[in-house]
Amino acid sequence: MAYLRSSFVFFLLAFVTYTYAATIEVRNNCPYTVWAASTPIGGGRRLDRGQTWVINAPRGTKMARIWGRTNCNFDGAGRGSCQTGDCGGVLQCTGWGKPPNTLAEYALDQFSNLDFWDISLVDGFNIPMTFAPTNPSGGKCHAIHCTANINGECPGSLRVPGGCNNPCTTFGGQQYCCTQGPCGPTDLSRFFKQRCPDAYSYPQDDPTSTFTCPSGSTNYRVVFCPNGVTSPNFPLEMPASDEEAK
């Protein structure tokens, strides 16, 4: 009987190990509430200051993104709106957020047995962020940051309530969005790159903005407002509603 129990426990551990490639811990250190969003897994979660949310990411997860929504107000059914990062007026996101929103992007257990991950400002900026492996191993497997006061310094042409849009969102076209083939940085994309050199500043900013870790070697952590206190130019929360993420 003991053998059967131990075999069953081993099976469960092996199943969990096989199923989940990594856990992603999302933490809010901002002095205001952030409504975290995660697709294609996770959905959404309200995070008051100091709260965390752990997402179990399966092997093969790709095109995944995590972002923070600000100035949200949801009813008990999880319907409402957010000033930045809104995903169709629902708490539990199934699609991408409306710019501007700082993105943590990742794909797990991809070619060459690597996890690929980055911070992207291609959808603009709303909240400072770090994205880090919990077990860094050197090379391109280390913490990355975007913690500059981009909202406070945002060019007037890109400034919107609660954030700073990327020029691709604002102006569109090949020059800013690389819609018809290769393109390079512009003066406006350099504004983002100079302040957050780890992050994507335009769609083809790959060489300095993509990071990798050996698959299965580490979990990951995303922190909103890693320095704890943000500039007054960052948004303050709206009055809390009665909703709570399930």
Swiss-Prot record:
Signal peptide as annotated in the record: 1-21
Family stated for the protein in its record: Belongs to the thaumatin family.
The organism of origin for this protein: Solanum commersonii (Commerson's wild potato)
Pfam families, per database record: Thaumatin
Could you tell me which CDD domains the record lists for this protein?
Answer: TLP-P
- What's the protein called, per UniProt? Osmotin-like protein OSML13
- The lineage's top-level taxon is Eukaryota
Question: Which cysteine residues pair off into disulfide bonds?
Answer: 30-225, 72-82, 87-93, 141-213, 146-196, 154-164, 168-177, 178-183
* Keyword Signal listed: yes
Its keywords, alphabetically, are: Disulfide bond, Signal, Stress response
Q: What induces it?
A: By abscisic acid (ABA), salt, salicylic acid, wounding, and fungal infection.
* Keyword field contains Membrane: no
Which PROSITE patterns does this chain map to? THAUMATIN_1, THAUMATIN_2
